[in-house]
A protein has these predicted regions:
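Short Fe-S-cluster ligation motifs
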Residues: 239-243, 247-281
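A generic structural signal for residues embedded in beta-strands
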Residues: 36, 84-85, 231
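FNR/FR-type flavoprotein reductase catalytic core
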Residues: 71-220
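Structural signal for conserved beta-strand scaffold positions within catalytic alpha/beta enzyme cores
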Residues: 6, 51, 161-163, 213, ...
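Ferredoxin-reductase
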Residues: 1-80
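Local cysteine-cluster metal-coordination motifs and their immediate loop/turn environment
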Residues: 119, 194-195, 216-246
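Short, surface-exposed secondary-structure boundary micro-motifs
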Residues: 39, 87-88, 234
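Short, Lys/Arg- and Gly-enriched loop/turn segments at beta-strand edges
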Residues: 42-51, 89-100, 241
Length: 281
């Protein structure tokens, strides 16, 4: 069992949990994720590792209530336990293969959409600590969905915020800020809703900027056996859980990935309705 040692509510629907998981905390790297099961009869929920502390053996996950299982996780309290936490899964971020001395002075632009700020944080932190220049864009529908602003400011050179309704930061979408910042980076990394990553990739192409995206496809087992997370990358079938979750944005068939994300929309709506849950899409 994996005990929850800290819980914070970041927004009305987003929670931060620190969980005891010593083995995972010792081996976790930026870019990797976990499969979490809240109860014996609960679903397996893929969640990116937001932070990890090898010294006290804890990992941090950020969960947005979007259905029955995520609602179960967010309703647990300090002292409660998750039934299963498997990981770390997936490949670490590509920059983990670059010698640390070569990262110093490199320029990275991170583009986070909504809860995508959570997986961006450990990557920005790792690069910042090794002397890279990190700029971060966080975009969301409104100010109530902006998370981790204070923490992000500590691990980047510049933080830019935009909201669809203009309630915080600039009014508009992340691609407008990308275009304004221009091609002055060695790499762009986009993490968030699939549609946001698609248009961030199109903007990166316009700017002639290399871009990596982290795909949040459907997942079940997290080891490549079920095939639920398959995506087309450079014309080949890849599994986001073992070949990713990060891929070259230019190679991803986003339209196919977007279609696959709606495969079980009806079943999700039925399950939410049965549990008395209602969410805006």
């Amino acid at each position: 069992m994996f005990k929850i040692v800290d819980k914070q509510q970041l927004t009305p629907l987003i929670y931060s949990l620190w969980v005891e998981a010593p083995r995972i905390a010792q081996s976790a790297k930026p870019g990797q994720f976990l499969i979490v099961r809240p109860s014996d009869n609960g679903e397996r929920v893929p969640l990116t590792i937001c932070d990890y502390n090898p010294d006290n053996g804890t990992v941090r996950i950020v969960v947005q209530i979007a259905g029955v299982s995520s609602n179960k996780i967010c309703n647990l309290n300090v002292g409660d336990c998750l039934t299963d936490v498997a990981g770390p899964l997936g490949k670490p971020s590509d920059f983990m293969e670059i010698p640390e001395e070569e990262l110093k002075g490199k320029r990275y632009l991170f583009v986070a959409g909504g809860v995508g700020a959570a997986p961006v944080y450990p990557q920005a932190k790792y690069l910042h600590e090794r002397g890279a220049k990190v700029d971060v864009i966080i975009g969301a529908r409104n100010k109530d969905l902006i998370i981790m602003e204070d923490e992000m400011r500590k691990v980047c050179s510049n933080l830019y915020i935009c909201t669809d309704d203009g309630s915080k930061g600039e009014k508009g979408v992340v691609t407008l800020l990308m275009e304004r910042l221009g091609n002055k980076y060695d790499m762009c990394v986009a993490i968030g809703p699939m549609i946001m990553m698609k248009f961030a990739t199109l903007m990166a192409k316009k700017l002639e900027l290399p871009i990596t995206v982290s795909l949040n496809t459907l997942m079940v087992d997290g080891t490549g056996m079920c095939g639920a997370c398959r995506v087309s990358v450079a014309g080949k079938t890849m599994f986001a859980c073992v070949d990713g979750p990060e891929f070259n944005g230019y190679d991803v068939d986003f339209d196919e990935a977007l279609r696959r994300q709606t495969l079980y929309r009806k079943e999700e709506q039925q399950a939410n309705a049965a549990a008395g849950l209602e969410f805006k899409r």
